[in-house]
């Protein structure tokens, strides 16, 4: 974490990576697209030198649960502005429960702080906790307005859980682009969108994610660290956004989105693993 924070002021202008450097990654992604009959978007941003590479980086994909990082960043921002108290509590009502709420479903009739709701949704992807946060930050519109404020003109949130995960082709609602969300994560963790204290908190929530062990974490190079958030939805949507770094490697922001495929969840997970491994190999091969 100390290494990650050391780069918080290093946000150079984005420069495109040489195509040869990521040639194998592109070949691997294309092969997976064909094998799964899927649409795939990938973005990679090196925060040390601003080097950027993408595949379908400007295409729209369903946000699914990757929106939760944005919603919690909005809560942290609003707390800085004195608009909300993260220690304020919300009563958990049975009528508010939605599908997949492993933390909140056990606390019906109790109260939860907004801070704890963010911890729950960021570490377990609890959907009711996410809706609690959305209610506190002005709903989907509040999140989208925040994104526009920090310069993200693409990412948008229109609905709450679980409807936002619908994932229909051509539906602009609740979508992002791999390039846009990578840039937004850069602003959250290394830019001026949040204070250093809240950058640390957001990073900590992502580091402590409990539901991504079978994705990029499973092929993370030895000695590397990861902070991530995944998502899944209809019509084959599967996604992950992550920051990876090591003692000798500046943070790299990675976003991978899959959509419009009939592949099983296991196959989609395997696709993310293979793409991640290919990306990591670009950086580990440089140090061999």
Curated annotation (Swiss-Prot):
The active site is at 65 (acyl-ester intermediate). The lineage of its organism: Bacteria, Pseudomonadati, Pseudomonadota, Gammaproteobacteria, Pseudomonadales. Gene3D superfamilies: DD-peptidase/beta-lactamase superfamily. Monomer. The keyword Hydrolase applies. Disulfide bonds join 72-118. Keywords: Antibiotic resistance, Disulfide bond, Hydrolase, Plasmid, Signal. Inhibited by p-chloromercuribenzoate but not by cloxacillin. Its EC number is 3.5.2.6. InterPro entries: Beta-lactam/transpept-like (IPR012338), Beta-lactam_cat (IPR045155), Beta-lactam_class-A (IPR000871), Beta-lactam_class-A_AS (IPR023650). Hydrolyzes penicillin, ampicillin and carbenicillin but not other antibiotics including oxacillin, methicillin and cloxacillin. Substrate binds at residues 229-231. It comes from Pseudomonas aeruginosa. The class A beta-lactamase family has a specific amino-acid numbering system, sometimes called Ambler or ABL numbering and often misspelt as Amber. A multiple sequence alignment was used to derive a consensus sequence and then the consensus was numbered taking into account insertions and deletions. This allows use of identical numbers, e.g. for active site residues, despite differences in protein length. UniProt always uses natural numbering of residues, hence there appear to be differences in numbering between this entry and some papers. This is Beta-lactamase PSE-1.
